[in-house]
Regions:
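Bacterial N-terminal signal peptides that target proteins for export
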Residues: 1-7
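Hydrophobic h-region of N-terminal signal peptides that target proteins for export
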Residues: 12-19
C-alpha cells in the first residue's frame, strides 16, 4: 500500500484481454501445508479476537482521501462475508493510530477527509513468519478505488519502513476504468492486480519490485470472487491467483539496510528483512499517489458507497519445516522470476 508508482514487469505468456488466449496452467497445491489460522466470517459480527481496526485520518502516507474508522458503517460481517465499505462523507478523526505516537499532543491531533473506510489488521493477535496465505475476495471498481491485502512487520526489527519490509499479496487500482496497460488492446478496461515487495532502506532509500496478473475482461476481479494467495518461505516468496502461480521473488534479489545513530547505514545479513514476524492487513483506500496518477487520473467521487468483500482468510504453515517454511512449495515453471534491486555499494 505504500507504492508511489509501479514499474510494470511483463509476464512471460501473460494474459491479454483476447478471448483466444489459452487458460493459464494451475499449479497443484504442494503437500505439507497445515491450516493454522482462519476466519470464514461465519459469525454475525467481526471477530475482535482475530482483527483490530486502525483508526486514523493520515492518508496512509500516500495522500489518500479516507479516514479509517471502527464504525459498523465501514466494516461488518453479513451473509458469511466481511464487508469493507468506503463512503463519501466528510469526516474528522484522529490523525494517527493511538499506538503510533507516544505523546498526548500527537494523539489529540485530528484531520478531516472526504471519505471513510476501514483497515483491519491481525497485529499481535496473529503474526507469522513464513506460510501460505489465502484470501478469497471481490474487489471494488472505479477511478481512485484501491483495495489491498498485504502484510507488515510486527516488530520492525530492522528499522522504519521499508528497512523492515512490506509484503503486498494483492493490490488493485482503478479496476474497470480504461487501462493504461501498453500490452492490452486499445479500449480495454483495467483488470490487473499486483503482487509486490517493499524493502531496502528507510524512506527515501526504499525500493520495491513486483509483477502484475492480468485477468480477462470477462473475468474482471471487480465482478467475481477470486482467491489471492502468497507462499512465503525463508529464501523465496511466490504469488498466486486462483491457484495460478504467476510470480516468484528469490532472496538474492532483495536486501535490507538499517540506519545507525551516527547516520550511517549497514546491510542486514541473511534473509532480512523477510525473516521476521509479519501480520495481515485488509483495507480499501480511496485516492492516493498511485491510483490518482494512472488510468483516468484523479479520483471519481461518483458511485459511493463501494465495498470490498472477503469470503475467507486462511493461513497455512509448512509441516515439513516450520522454521524455514521450505518443503511445501506450490510451483509452476512458467511463473515470472521477479528481478529485484541490488544493495548500493
Amino acid at each position: 500500500m505504500s507504492v508511489k508508482s509501479y514499474a510494470v514487469i511483463l509476464l512471460t505468456g501473460a494474459l491479454s484481454a483476447c478471448q483466444q488466449t489459452p487458460a493459464p496452467v494451475k499449479a497443484s497445491l504442494g503437500e505439507g501445508w497445515q491450516l493454522v489460522w482462519q476466519d470464514e466470517f461465519s459469525q454475525n459480527d467481526l471477530d475482535l479476537t482475530k482483527w483490530q481496526h486502525e483508526v486514523n485520518c493520515r492518508g496512509g502516507g500516500n495522500d489518500e482521501l479516507q479516514c479509517y474508522t471502527a464504525r459498523s458503517e465501514n466494516s461488518f460481517v453479513k451473509d458469511g462475508l466481511l464487508h469493507i465499505v468506503a463512503r463519501q462523507e466528510q469526516y474528522t478523526g484522529p490523525l494517527h493510530n493511538s499506538d503510533e505516537v507516544s505523546s498526548d499532543a500527537e494523539r489529540e491531533k485530528q484531520a478531516t477527509q472526504p471519505f471513510t473506510s476501514a483497515r483491519l489488521r491481525t497485529k499481535n493477535l496473529a503474526d507469522w513468519r513464513y506460510g501460505r496465505f489465502e484470501i478469497r475476495a471481490k474487489l471494488p471498481a472505479g477511478q481512485g478505488a484501491w483495495p489491498a491485502i498485504w502484510m507488515l512487520p510486527t516488530d520492525w526489527r530492522y528499522g522504519r519502513w521499508a528497512s523492515s519490509g512490506e509484503i503486498d499479496i494483492m493490490e488493485a487500482v482503478n479496476l474497470k476504468t480504461l487501462t493504461d496497460d501498453k500490452t492490452a488492446p486499445a479500449g480495454s478496461l483495467e483488470t490487473r492486480v499486483h503482487g509486490t515487495l517493499h524493502y531496502g532502506g528507510p524512506a527515501p532509500k526504499n525500493v520495491y519490485s513486483g509483477s502484475p496478473y492480468r485477468f480477462s475482461e470477462a473475468n474482471n476481479p471487480a465482478d467475481n470472487f477470486h482467491v489471492y494467495a502468497l507462499e512465503w518461505q525463508q529464501d523465496e516468496i511466490r504469488w498466486y491467483v486462483d491457484d495460478v502461480h504467476y510470480a516468484t521473488f528469490r532472496h538474492d534479489q532483495w536486501y535490507s539496510t538499517s540506519q545507525q545513530q551516527d547516520g550511517s547505514f549497514i546491510e542486514n545479513t541473511g534473509f532480512a528483512p523477510f525473516d521476521q514476524r509479519f501480520h495481515l492487513l485488509l483495507n480499501f483506500a480511496v485516492g492516493g499517489n498511485w491510483p490518482a496518477n494512472v488510468n483516468d487520473k484523479g479520483v471519481d467521487f461518483a458511485g459511493y458507497p463501494k465495498q470490498m468483500l472477503v469470503d475467507y482468510v486462511r493461513v497455512f504453515q509448512c509441516s515439513k519445516n516450520s522454521e524455514t517454511g521450505i518443503g511445501c512449495a506450490t510451483k509452476q515453471p512458467s511463473a515470472v522470476q521477479i528481478k529485484g534491486k541490488t544493495y548500493p555499494q
